[in-house]
A protein has these predicted regions:
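Carbohydrate-associated surface elements
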Residues: 181, 201
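Conserved acidic donor-binding segment of nucleotide-sugar-dependent glycosyltransferases
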Residues: 347-348, 352-359, 368-374
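Aromatic "clamp/platform" in nucleotide-sugar-dependent glycosyltransferases that forms part
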Residues: 315
C-alpha cells in the first residue's frame, strides 16, 4: 500500500511538531509494509539536512502561493510560515501521477481541497489529519492566524470554491485528530463523519539513551544550571514571551534557573519580542535560544534530559507531541491547561497543569518540581511508564494502517456502523 502525504509547508530548518508527527507516522507505517511519499511546497533549502530524505522518504515539491494582494513581503512570509491558506495548480497534476492508494492531507483549506479532488478523480480514499485543530481553537489564536492578512485583499475564494475547500471536513473519508475535545466538536458538527482520535507517537527507546554529555558539549553554558526547557517553534500560540517574563520571579526563588527555548524562529515578530523582553529584563545570561535542533538528535534529547522541568506555556496546543518526548526522556512536565495537555496529563501523576491566566499557579508548579524531590521522581517514573505503554511508534502506526485498509474495501467506503466496529483499535469517538 502506498500513501501520498500532503503538507502545507515543509522547511527542515523550521522543523516542528507537525513534521515530527508525520515522520514518525511514516516510519511506523514502514513497519506495517506501507510506503509513503511527501508532497510539499517549493523550498529554497538544500535537501542535504532533510530528515525526511535521510529517512528514505521521497519529497516531491509543488509550487504554492498565497492569493492575497496588497500585503508586505513580511506578511506574506508569515502567511506561508504559519496558517496561511495557500493554493497550488501543480499539486493536483502531481497527485494524479502519484501511484498512491490513499491520499492523506496534513493540512486543511485549499491544499486539502486539492488533495480531496485528486482522490475523487483517482477513486481512492482521502483522509485528513488535524495537527493544529479546526474547531477547538481559541479566539485569540484565530486572530493571530489572520493578522498577516491585514491591509490586503484575499482573492482566493474562487479557487477555494473550485476545490470545495470549505467542505473538506464534511466530504473527506475520515478525519484523524489527536485531541478528544476536537473530536467531540467535529462529531457534533458532522454526525455522519468518521472522526478518529489518533494520538501521536514517540520512539521511546531512542529518548531513553543518555545524551546529556552531547548537550553539555554543544551548549557549555548550561553547566551547573537548573534548566527549564521548552521545545517549540517561535510562533504566537506558543506564548514564549510570557514564559520569559516569568523568569525573574523563578530566579528569585531558584537562582540557578535557566530557561532553554529550543525551536526555529518561524514568525519574525515573535522572535523580535523575545529578544526585546530578554534585553529589557536583563536575562541575556539566563535564557538560551538554541534555534532549531534536529528531531531525535543527541543535542535535543540531551537538553531535555538535563532539564529539571519541561514547561509548556501555549495558549493553544491540540496535542503536545513534545510532552511525549519529555516523558520518554524521563523529564518532569508542567503545562498550561490547553486541550491537548489536558487530555494527555494526569495531574499529579504524569505532570502538573496550571492556568496561564494565573501566573501564580505556574510558579506553584515550578516550586513543586524544584523543591519536592519525591514528587519530581514520581512524575518522571509514572510518565515514563505511561509513554511506553500507550505512545510508542509501532502500535500507533498500526492503527492508522488499519484505517487505510478499511477505507480501501470494496466501494472504498465503509458505513459508519462498520467504522464503529473498529473503534477499539482506532480510537474513534462514539
Amino acid at each position: 500500500m502506498k500513501i501520498a502525504h500532503i503538507l502545507r509547508k515543509y522547511e527542515p530548518a523550521q522543523w516542528g511538531g507537525t513534521e515530527t508527527a508525520v515522520l514518525r507516522l511514516i516510519q511506523g507505517l514502514q513497519t506495517q509494509g506501507v510506503s509513503s511519499a511527501i508532497h510539499a511546497p517549493d523550498s529554497a533549502a538544500s535537501s542535504e539536512n532533510d530528515p525526511m530524505c535521510a529517512a528514505g522518504v521521497k519529497v516531491s515539491r509543488y509550487h504554492a502561493f498565497a492569493p492575497v494582494w496588497g500585503i508586505s513581503q513580511r506578511q506574506r512570509d508569515e502567511l506561508v510560515s504559519w496558517g496561511g491558506n495557500l493554493f497550488s495548480f501543480d499539486l493536483f497534476a502531481q497527485l494524479l501521477q502519484s501511484p498512491a492508494d490513499v491520499i492523506h492531507s496534513h493540512a486543511l483549506n485549499r491544499i486539502a481541497g486539492i488533495g480531496l479532488r485528486a482522490a475523487r478523480w483517482k477513486k481512492i480514499p482521502h483522509v485528513v489529519t488535524l495537527h493544529g485543530g479546526a474547531l477547538d481553537i481559541p479566539a485569540e489564536v484565530n486572530e493571530q492566524l489572520t493578522a498577516p492578512l491585514k491591509g490586503g485583499f484575499e482573492w482566493g475564494k474562487a479557487l477555494g470554491a473550485l476545490v470545495q475547500s470549505r467542505r473538506v471536513l464534511e466530504l473527506t473519508d475520515a478525519i484523524f485528530t489527536c485531541n478528544p475535545r476536537e473530536a467531540q466538536l467535529l462529531q457534533r458538527k458532522y454526525p455522519q463523519q468518521r472522526v478518529i482520535v489518533q494520538p501521536h507517537s514517540v520512539p521511546a527507546a531512542q529518548y531513553a539513551v543518555d545524551h546529556c554529555d552531547a548537550a553539555l558539549k554543544a551548549f557549555p553554558q548550561i553547566a551547573g544550571r537548573d534548566l527549564i526547557v521548552k521545545v517549540a517553534r517561535l510562533d504566537p500560540a506558543k506564548n514564549l514571551p510570557w514564559l520569559v517574563r516569568q523568569l525573574p520571579e523563578i530566579k528569585r526563588r531558584h537562582p540557578k534557573a535557566m530557561l532553554v527555548l529550543i525551536g526555529a524562529g518561524t514568525t519574525q515578530h515573535v522572535v523580535e519580542e523575545l529578544h526585546r523582553e530578554i534585553g529589557r529584563l536583563g536575562l541575556q545570561n539566563d535564557v538560551l535560544l538554541t534555534g532549531g535542533l534536529a528531531s531525535g538528535s543527541p543535542e535535543l534529547i540531551g537538553l531535555i534530559q538535563q532539564a529539571r522541568v519541561f514547561a509548556l506555556s501555549s495558549t493553544a496546543e491540540p496535542f503536545g507531541i513534545v510532552i511525549l518526548e519529555a516523558w520518554a526522556a524521563g523529564t518532569a512536565v508542567i503545562s498550561s491547561r490547553t486541550s491537548g495537555p489536558l487530555a494527555l496529563i494526569d495531574h499529579g501523576r504524569t505532570g502538573l497543569l496550571y492556568d496561564v491566566e494565573t501566573p501564580s499557579t505556574f510558579h506553584q508548579a515550578i516550586d513543586a518540581v524544584f523543591n519536592d524531590a519525591k514528587l519530581h521522581q514520581h512524575l518522571r517514573e509514572e510518565a515514563r511508564a505511561h509513554v511506553l505503554a500507550e505512545y510508542d511508534v509501532p502500535s500507533i502506526a498500526a492503527r492508522v494502517a488499519k484505517v487505510y485498509e478499511d477505507l480501501r474495501r470494496p466501494l472504498a467506503r465503509l458505513s459508519k456502523a462498520d467504522m464503529n466496529d473498529s473503534r477499539s483499535t482506532t480510537y474513534a469517538i462514539p
